[in-house]
Regions:
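Aromatic-residue-lined binding/catalytic grooves and analogous aromatic/hydrophobic interfacial grooves
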Residues: 1-172
Length: 172
């Protein structure tokens, strides 16, 4: 009621101050969900490292050369689909050798199975009072192998792979 009163009086500063206390402790607006780690397992120094962002196509690109092979990662996020896609390519067939893992700065568990990583957890605070999440990372590859261990997917001899990352939370 006090926030509404402040808004009707056009006292936006007071309304903003009051809304900070609505949900209580550990209910920050934005908390980190997960971190996708892609660790290149190839030999050699990185050269021609480049990052680009195209606002027109909503595409972020990272590229580098290592031992004469050009590697590229293209990142695309779709808000309607609640999905992030990352395409890994190389200028030489079967040149992608990397480890992909998930971690988070908030309480979580990670499980690897087949070509998929699943991370579950909850926002800071007591689990029974916090927002819970489940995110799935799935990889589609053309060739090579993907081997899961406890919490990592190992890609070996892959020419191209697309990583799909989706998320769902208990937030209403």
């Amino acid at each position: 009621p006090k926030i509404r009163e402040a808004l009707f009086k056009e006292d936006y500063k007071a309304a903003d101050s009051l809304q900070l206390h609505v949900q209580g402790h550990n209910s920050e607006y934005y908390q980190p969900l997960a971190i996708i780690n892609i660790k290149d397992r190839n030999e050699g120094a990185y050269t021609q490292y480049q990052r680009q962002l195209s606002l027109d196509s909503a595409l972020a690109t990272l590229s580098y050369t290592r031992d004469g092979i050009k590697y590229q990662r293209e990142y695309f996020a779709s808000h309607p689909d609640q999905m992030i896609a990352i395409r890994l390519t190389a200028s030489k067939k079967k040149a992608i050798n990397c480890d992909i893992s998930l971690t988070s700065l908030i309480p979580h568990q990670v499980k690897a199975s087949g070509k998929q990583l699943t991370i579950t957890g909850h926002a800071m605070g007591k689990p029974e009072n916090s927002t819970h999440f489940c995110s799935i990372l799935n990889i589609k590859n053309q060739d090579g192998t993907i081997t899961p261990t406890d919490s990592t997917l190992h890609l070996k001899g892959v020419s191209e792979a697309v990583i799909y990352f989706v998320n769902e939370t208990s937030y209403n």
